Every structure is written in structure tokens, then in C-alpha cells.
Amino acid sequence: MRQHLFSLDVLQVQQGTGSGFVWDTTGHIVTNFHVIDGGDSFRVRLADQSEHAAKVVGYAADKDLAVLRINAPPANLTPLPLGVSQRLLVGQTVLAVGNPFGLDHSLTVGVVSALGRELRSPGGRKIYDVIQTDAAINPGNSGGPLLDSNGRLIGVNSAIYSPSGASAGIGFAIPVDVVKRLVPQLIARRRPVVPGIGIIALPESIAERNQLEGVVVQEVAAGSPAARAGLEGLRRARGGGFYVGDRIVAVNGKRVQSLDDLTHVFEQQGVGAIVELTVMRGGERRTIKMPLVAVE
């Protein structure tokens, strides 16, 4: 299977193989969602060559992350120390570890080529703040760790840009700050906690076609923070057609142009945070504060 541009299903040499890393001594293993997507059963081979049956604990398709669990002696499980992706610098040395082309426990060295890239996840949403590296990432590396020179986890190798299907010096990793936030949620409740305000947004294609800036509110859930704050969705006009709903154009002073942008800011703030929305209703601009709650 080949998908070249920002491929999340990179060319596979061995069907259904990928990489991962130990999260804790209770047997949790982190990998990419696209590595386990569609699989019925899974086995994990550790560095000591022991193999273990694995079960899926949880996953976040929108972030291309998944957590498995194996039953192995704690003495055989060495979790990776965690770094901080916000502190990364372009030019910093990084190491990619994985199983390229089925070659177990391979390590390649490179640098951080760029920060703040965006990728499309298997779930269709944007992944923000992605790390670009020239460390060789090949088929089979997906789900493996990207480390700094001190051996701390700074990202999860997820994708490559390649006309040929092999490494072209442009690889991408999900930042560890996202991993640190999501993995405990996946372990605790199988799915990520999604912060929101209780709205359904108008599809972006319709908003763009009508040259509507920001996130257009289509519906507001009853009893939600958005409803309590008085946000309005689309309304049917008497003569047919609709009145445009409120448009969210900024959150905490940061401009948002899409639902992905809005969700990203909400995720950074977290459930329980108070956010300040800049809303356009007709030609009037207003500022509204409301709390973020967990939404499905």
C-alpha cells in the first residue's frame, strides 16, 4: 500500500508491522493508531526478543495514537523518560528508533528540521505542532519513539513525505506534549477527553463557498455552555433559506478559521478552563466567556 504525501499508511514491507515503546511498568505500549487500525489480534516483541499477546486499551484516531497492553514482568519493561516538545529547537539532534523494513531495533540520527507542522490524521482532523525531522524514518518506523540526545521521548514517528515510499529526509512525529496529555486518558477511559462548548459547526466547504470567516455555528446543544451564553445557530427565514448563525472568529484573542483550529485551542486549555470567544453576529462583534466541558 502506498500513500506518499504525508503518508499515514506508509509502504509496508511486512503486512501489519510497526513500532512502539513502553509507557509504564504495568505493560502499556504506545504506537500509532494507523499501525493497529483494522487489526484483530496483536503481538509485541520486546528488546529481549520475548513476544507477548497484546490487547488494545484505547486509541485517538484524530491524533494517530493508540495504547496496547501486554502481560510482561515489570523487570522486563523500561519506560522511556519524557521530554518537553515545546522546548525543542530547530537544529537540535534527534534519534528515531523503530523497525524499518522489519529490521528490529534500528536507530537513525538527524536533527529537528522544522517545528509547528500540520498533518491530517487517520480520523481526518489536523494534528498541530508536528515535528519535522531528517532522521531516516522508513516503513515499519511508524509508532516508534523520536528521542532527544539525552534519550528522552520528544515525539512519536508517524509519517513521511516520499515520492518513492522510502525515507527522503522528511519525516514527521507527533509531539510528546500531545502524547503526555492523551495517553493517560486512553488508559483511564479508552477515548480522549474532548473539551468543547456544545455546538455543531457548519461544514467548512459551505462556509468557504459563502465566504464566511471563522467557525459558523450551525446548532447549539440544549443546556450547553454555548446555549447558556446565548450563542445562536442557523435560523430558518420566513421566505425560505436561513439566517447565518453566530461566527466564532477568535478564542482568547487567537484567530480561528476552522473547527480544527477551534478544537486545537480548546485542547490546549482543557476541560474546566474559561475561554473568551470573539463572536460575530451579523455585523456586530461581541466577546463572550464560557467554560469548557467534556463533549463526545
Predicted features by range, described:
Residues 29-30, 228-259:
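Conserved PDZ fold ligand-binding element
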Residues 290-291:
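C-terminal edge beta-strand
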